[in-house]
Curated annotation (Swiss-Prot):
Compositional bias segments (type: Basic residues): 898-907
Transmembrane segments: none
Protein name: Methionine synthase
Gene: metH
A molecular function (GO) term: zinc ion binding
Biased composition (Basic and acidic residues): 886-897, 910-924
Record remark: domains: Modular enzyme with four functionally distinct domains. The isolated Hcy-binding domain catalyzes methyl transfer from free methylcobalamin to homocysteine. The Hcy-binding domain in association with the pterin-binding domain catalyzes the methylation of cob(I)alamin by methyltetrahydrofolate and the methylation of homocysteine. The B12-binding domain binds the cofactor. The AdoMet activation domain binds S-adenosyl-L-methionine. Under aerobic conditions cob(I)alamin can be converted to inactive cob(II)alamin.
């Protein structure tokens, strides 16, 4: 066990030794048994519902319950003290009895435990501490009040003889900390130390009540020195598995679980718990085998009968009949907010610690704090989050201010508002303490040093007392009694002293120490400061070489003090890069002000490097060079500079530029001024639409990315909405698009995808067209009815599925039949379409005009051309538009000629082909070992931690494919890599934080299973039982290639003949994953509210998170499938995540409707096998999954299985 300041004492019990030797069994529910005890109101002394008073009035009843659980096989029972806390007993006006009732309850359990203890079977008592009814994080009560009440309760338990304290059903991390530290204080007072166990409660939403992910709970709890962590209450075992998996994989202490007997259902007697004793025992035995648990038991709805079955199952684990899983812990040193954990390691980058929430470093923050404008302070914190910070440095120290009051006000608010952990930065011990008492997550303390020594009254000792008690991480500055260390040797010497002191005397892990090697400005020109940059870099390198587990950090911006803002930005960025190369782990910095190294002009970068490394030479001083390069240059990224540039433009040019820039600030003022000079409709047609035209040109030339296009459309929409109330009624028709034309848009029947169609809607409607957006799954009948009713000029159809291309062809044929082809030109778009298919094949089918629109701006161009022709507007000969139209016509003529030539060649080749004999089976090896599945049938998984599967998110698919972040060609603008750093990853981090906080990502779920199967020719047969002669449940038929290797999916499953010969069938896994309906609803709300860029980004995240979850679960299946010798299928997995996207693992995952398995009807059979309605997924008549962010597949384990087409 890890030694910390909290647990370096000797325990007065052998409980932990017993836990290390075998799996132990806890008891079940107390409340359920009390309800069956036929107690009267007199038994409760009129305090109905106060179970703790029974410790005084009916100890006999409690003794009986404890005895039943022990006799059922429990090793430990919990005391009847769950509500012995200030809020519960305070509600009955008996808060003064906390210690007394805690002692009485413990004595009762102790008496029964001692009575039933034998030499072969010792019985133990856990002192139960519940959460109470008031949550300190939400300000219901104060931390110290809660902590002190828990101290009283723990003193009673120690007096009564408890073997350990169990802090259970924790809903608030700050309440949890109060209970743990209150218990530790009681042990110090009593002079008796016992272990402390913690059980957190994760709701069906996948987080604790206040939104904490399991990773946040672990990061906050483990450093407090607790001896075991686990889960209890709220759900049954099925909903707990993923959270247990996280604890098993990452906790360095024992893990336990006490689930409810399932989720309650409404029965004849009210709410009932459905899980039967054998079902609970089976689930817990599975957890022991999979997660290596140390303690299992039951919570609500469980009885002695449940515990009897559990004890029997655990006995089989302990005697080796059933294997107990081995835990392979991957420790990730982290800090946490209330909501999420942030690892110190942020490779390949560094941990960015936002510096703007600092009263000494930010004038704006300081003034807001002094004015008690806390909302502005919080907005600054949010800006740091959006800017890419991982932590927030919070400093309220300012002369003349009450730092404790300021810290309480800000830390208390940030606790619930910020998803980022907090670094508490103060020289005042009471201020640091106030922060720690308002933040339940694991904080960083900034900082300690030896400036006034390390004596008992030194600030070092006083600060470390807080660090050790609260389990915080700590920044340690290389300062000793002689002052700040400036040379490599001195920095390393002081760092060694700090590391040895903090680990040996305070029990803090090396991984929780952030050594600041200090940096000083190198911009003064003074000789003694010229080498300071080199000394810091070399000290970091040497320190990481000696102590790789120790974190390193820097207050980065000190290096550039004295330079102008733009020069500072460059020097800070270059210095950070050099420090990072030397091993720097984190930096206190304004993250959005750091430039990617490849975006800094070479001359500036070289001057900064020369300054850092003091490369002066005759006639060359890099400091002077850098100052000369930035003379009179202000920071190009500052808002103030951009506003000043806009202000210089003429009014109407400025309005158009605001559209191009997507800049809404100042828009209303400009529009008001513009309306004094021309009518609103003229402003729209002559100026705002000019801006949108420029946006289209920039997008078409690759100089503007799709997210910024949508930002421009948002501003256009806002401008039109602002002008509409000032228009004449007839002019308001612009809002309906009558000035330019009308299009009816729809996603075709059977297709639920609408992102592309909605982007077309956004671009067309903000360029003067009326768009009638019918939504998804629209039959042609409805499309044409609306087109006729609205007198549409054009019909637009979209679809993502391959099947949708067939539907589009059928729709065009129907339009021919109805005689409307000449009336309605048609625009077609969608991922499955190609230009060739539309302009050649479909153009032959349709009797009117049909056009392919690759994207929204091509759709706009086509609309302009169609409407110009309808209005009889001829293009001026020789004009750019006329020349472009002529070029398009020539290209179309060439394409059609090529198409006709290709068709003739294809017909000739087919006629010349000789018949090929297709074999019954391909050359795929049939004699491969079949892995053993962990179970047969299906299981559901809920409550998945977002952090578990975001590692499988394909960034390139998101940033390039979904968001359209494309670098500018020819070096005339940011590259794709630049955009990833400046836009992609910061926006992704922002959205993941925001969506997690809103609870939108809490509904991710999986249903998956393993099914016995054999192959017969081109069929895979799923069997009712894992026997070759078992009955058929379902049969899937797949096509076979007619040339080449003659592959068929059935070839990758063991044949029935071989299965019969070996008496062993094959295994066919199926999986279905979903992100749930809330993210789809959230996306829809963004579209309706005209938040176009947000709409694009969140939709893309939803799609790619679904794919990430599918990839993650596919890996889980490979981990669970084991071959002889206990070798898992995942042993062949690649190390790099990127290789997963290149299928760099064994086997493959196939989805019906694509490639080698084109029959989408087979999805019905898979749905019947998996029953995904249990996780909220249904299938439509068109065989589409709902919610949209869902995907399904079957998995082939065969090593030769790869994707192929038929």
């Amino acid at each position: 066990m890890r030694v910390t300041a909290a647990n370096q004492h000797q325990y007065d019990t052998d409980l932990l030794e017993t836990l290390a030797q075998r799996v132990m069994v806890g008891d079940g529910a107390m409340g359920t048994q009390l309800q069956d005890a036929e107690l009267t109101l007199d038994d409760f002394r009129g305090l109905e519902g106060c179970n703790e008073i029974l410790n005084e009035t009916r100890p006999d009843v409690l003794e009986t319950i404890h005895r039943r659980y022990f006799e059922a096989g429990a090793d430990l029972v919990e005391t009847n003290t769950f509500g012995c806390n200030l809020s519960n007993l305070g509600d009955y006006d008996i808060a003064d009895k906390i210690r007394d009732l805690s002692q009485r309850g413990t004595v009762i359990a102790r008496r029964v435990a001692d009575e039933l203890t034998t030499p072969d079977h010792k019985r133990y008592v856990l002192g139960s501490m519940g959460p109470g009814t008031k949550l300190p994080t939400l300000g219901h009560t104060e931390y110290r009040v809660v902590r002190d009440a828990y101290t009283e309760s723990a003193l009673g338990m120690l007096d009564g003889g408890a073997d350990a304290v169990l802090v259970e059903t924790c809903q608030d991390l700050l309440q949890l900390k109060a209970a743990v530290l209150g218990s530790r204080r009681a042990m110090t007072q009593a002079g008796r130390h016992i272990p402390v166990f913690v059980h957190v409660t994760v709701e069906t939403t996948g987080t604790m009540l206040l939104g904490s992910e399991i990773g946040a709970a672990l990061a906050a709890v483990e450093p407090l020195g607790v001896d075991m962590i686990g889960l209890n209450c709220a759900t049954g075992p099925a909903e707990m598995s993923e959270h247990l998996r996280h604890l098993s994989k990452h906790a360095r202490i024992p893990v336990s679980v006490m689930p409810n007997a399932g989720l309650p259902v409404l029965g004849a007697k009210g709410a009932e718990y459905p899980l039967q004793p054998d079902e609970l025992a089976e689930a817990l035995a599975g957890f022991i085998a999979e997660f290596g648990l140390s303690l299992v038991g039951g919570c609500c709805g469980t009885t002695p009968d449940h515990i009897r079955e559990v004890a029997a199952a655990v006995a089989r684990c302990n005697d080796g009949t059933v294997p107990r899983g081995e835990r392979h812990v991957t420790y990730e040193p982290s800090v946490s907010s209330l909501y999420t954990a942030i690892p110190f390691a942020q490779k390949p980058s560094v941990l960015m610690i936002g510096e703007r929430t600092n009263a000494n470093g930010s004038k704006v923050f300081r003034e807001a704090m002094i004015a008690e404008d806390y909302q502005k302070c919080l907005d600054i914190a949010k800006d740091q989050t959006r800017g890419g910070a991982h932590l927030l440095d919070l400093c309220v120290d300012y002369v003349g201010r009450n730092g404790v009051a300021d810290m309480k006000a800000l830390a208390g608010r940030l606790a619930t508002v910020s998803t980022l952990p907090i670094m508490l930065d103060s020289t005042e011990i009471p201020v640091l303490q106030a922060g720690l008492e308002h933040l339940g997550g694991r904080c960083v303390i900034n900082s300690v040093n030896y400036e006034d020594g390390d004596g008992p009254e030194s600030r070092f000792v006083k600060t470390m007392e807080l660090v050790a008690e609260h389990g915080a991480a700590v920044v340690a500055l290389t300062i000793d009694e002689q002052g700040q260390a400036r040379t490599v040797e001195k920095k390393v010497e002081v760092a060694e002293r700090l590391i040895n002191d903090i680990t040996s005397n305070w029990g803090v892990d090396k991984s929780a120490i952030l050594i600041d090697c200090l940096t000083f400005t190198i911009a003064t020109g003074q000789e003694e400061s010229r080498k300071d940059g080199i000394e810091t870099i070399d000290a970091i390198r040497e320190l990481k070489k000696r102590h790789p587990a120790v974190q390193t950090t820097l207050g980065l911006s000190n290096i550039s003090f004295g330079l102008n803002p733009s020069a500072r930005q460059v020097l800070n960025s270059v210095f950070l890069h050099e420090c990072q190369e030397a091993g720097l782990d984190s930096a206190i910095v304004h993250a959005s002000k750091i430039l990617p190294i490849n975006r800094i002009p070479e001359e500036q970068r070289q001057a900064a490097l020369d300054l850092v490394y003091d490369r002066r030479r005759e006639g060359y001083d890099p400091l002077q060079k850098l100052m000369w390069l930035f003379k009179g240059v202000s920071s190009p990224s500052s808002k103030e500079t951009r506003e000043a540039e806009l202000a210089k433009l003429p009014l109407f040019d400025r309005l158009a530029q605001r559209i191009v820039d997507g800049e809404r600030n100042g828009l209303d003022v400009d529009l008001d001024e513009a309306m004094t000079q021309k009518p609103p409709l003229a402003i729209i047609n002559e100026n705002l639409l000019d801006g949108m035209k420029t946006v289209g040109e920039l997008f078409g030339s690759g100089q503007m990315q799709l997210p910024f296009v949508l930002q421009s459309a948002e501003v256009m929409k806002a401008a039109v909405a602002y002008l509409e109330p000032h228009m004449e009624k007839s002019d308001c028709d612009f809002g309906k698009g009558l000035a330019k034309g009308r299009i009816v848009l729809a996603t075709v029947k059977g297709d639920v995808h609408d992102i592309g169609k909605n982007l077309v809607d956004i671009i067309l409607s903000n360029n003067g067209y009326e768009v009638v957006n019918l939504g998804i799954k629209q039959p042609i009948t409805n499309i044409l009815e609306v087109a006729e009713d609205k007198s549409a000029d054009v019909v637009g159809m979209s679809g993502l599925l391959v099947k949708s291309t067939v539907i589009m062809k059928e729709n065009l044929e129907e339009m021919n039949t109805r005689g409307v082809a000449e009336k309605f030109p048609v625009l077609l778009g969608g991922a499955a379409l190609t230009r060739s298919y539309v302009e050649n094949d479909l153009a032959e089918v349709y009797e009117g005009e049909v056009h392919y629109a690759r994207d929204a701006f091509e759709g706009l161009k086509l609309m302009d051309t169609i409407m110009s022709a309808k209005r009889g507007e001829a293009l001026a000969p020789g004009s750019p538009e006329s020349l472009a139209a002529e070029a398009d016509r020539n290209k179309e003529t060439e394409r059609k000629a090529r198409h006709e030539r290709s068709k003739r060649i294809a017909v000739q080749r087919k006629a010349a082909e000789e018949p090929v004999e297709v074999p019954e089976r391909s050359d795929v090896p049939s004699d491969v070992e079949v892995p053993a599945p962990p179970f047969w049938g299906s299981r559901i998984i809920k409550g998945l931690a977002v952090a578990d599967y975001t590692g499988f998110l394909d960034e390139r698919a998101l940033f390039l494919g979904q968001w359209g972040l494309r670098g500018v060609r020819g070096g005339a603008g940011p590259s794709y890599e630049d955009l990833v750093q400046t836009e992609g990853r910061p926006r992704l981090r922002y959205w993941l934080d925001r969506l997690s906080t809103y609870g939108v990502l809490a509904y991710a779920a999986v249903v998956y299973g393993y099914f016995p199967a054999v192959s017969e020719d081109n069929d895979i047969v799923v069997l009712a039982e894992p026997r070759p002669d078992a009955e058929q449940r379902y049969r899937f038929t797949f096509p076979r290639q007619q040339r080449g290797r003659f592959l068929c999916i059935a070839d990758f499953i063991r044949s029935r003949d071989l299965a019969t010969e070996r008496s062993e069938v094959d295994v066919l896994p199926f999986q279905l994953v979903t992100m749930g309906q809330p993210i789809a609803d959230f996306v829809g709300e963004l579209f309706v509210s005209n938040s176009y860029r947000d709409y694009l980004e969140v939709h893309g995240i939803g799609v790619q998170l679904t794919e990430a979850l599918a990839e993650y679960w596919h890996r889980r299946i490979r981990e669970e499938l084991k071959f002889s010798g206990n070798r898992t299928m995942s042993a062949d997995d690649p190390e790099a995540v990127e290789d997963y996207f290149k299928l760099g693992y064994r086997g493959a995952r196939f989805a019906f409707g694509y490639g080698a398995c084109p029959d989408l009807e087979d999805r019905i059979k898979m749905m019947e096998l998996l029953q995904p309605e249990r996780i909220g997924v249904t299938i439509s008549e068109e065989l589409q999954l709902h919610p949209e962010q869902s995907t399904d597949a079957f998995v082939l384990h065969h090593p030769a299985a790869k994707y192929f087409n038929v």
